[in-house]
């Protein structure tokens, strides 16, 4: 006997829930931080994103120190959820945690960790429409 997957709020509300998350990828972003040293290896770090908190953030990650900033992978992370970011090469993942306005991007915990220092957080954006009071 199979079990049907449960969706938040049932059928009709699920469509709205799904649309909200689809819209996050296309929403307007507010630049909160740029890594001034994005051409150097990056271990673990905490970034103060200012006084305006967001429920959702977009974190852009470079795959290598030598990559031009236009070649980044954008990751959406949500406050209160277990999140990680990646640059889509070598399957290197970094855990993201929140503490007030501080966002900590940790050292990689999976993938080809022999080259982890090359997966570099580049920019953090707040996603408009998810502002917290």
State where each predicted segment sits:
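Beta-rich globular "head" domains
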Residues: 23-83
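Compositionally biased, intrinsically disordered/low-complexity regions enriched for serine, proline
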Residues: 2-5, 66, 105, 118
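Intrinsically disordered, low-complexity segments enriched in proline/serine/threonine
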Residues: 7-10, 71, 110, 123
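Intrinsic-disorder/low-complexity loop/linker signature
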Residues: 10, 18, 23-24, 51, ...
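Extracellular jelly-roll beta-sandwich "head" domains, especially the C-terminal globular C1q domain
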Residues: 86-133
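Generic cytosolic/nucleocytoplasmic N-terminal low-complexity/intrinsically disordered segments
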Residues: 12-18, 61, 73-74, 81, ...
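Hydrophobic beta-strand residues in large extracellular and virion-surface proteins
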Residues: 17, 32, 47, 57-59, ...
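Enriched but not universal
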Residues: 1-26, 32, 125-133
């Amino acid at each position: 006997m199979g079990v049907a997957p449960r969706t938040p709020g049932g059928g009709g509300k699920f469509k709205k829930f799904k649309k909200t998350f689809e819209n996050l990828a296309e929403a307007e972003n507010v630049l909160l931080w740029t890594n001034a040293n994005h051409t150097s290896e990056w271990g673990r770090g905490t970034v103060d994103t200012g006084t305006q908190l967001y429920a959702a953030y977009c974190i852009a990650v470079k795959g290598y120190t030598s990559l031009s900033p236009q070649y980044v992978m954008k990751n959406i992370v949500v406050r209160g959820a277990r999140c990680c970011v990646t640059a889509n090469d070598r399957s290197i993942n970094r855990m993201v945690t929140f503490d007030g306005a501080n966002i900590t991007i940790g050292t990689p915990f999976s993938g080809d960790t022999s080259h982890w220092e090359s997966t570099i957080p580049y920019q953090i954006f707040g996603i408009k429409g998810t502002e917290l009071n």
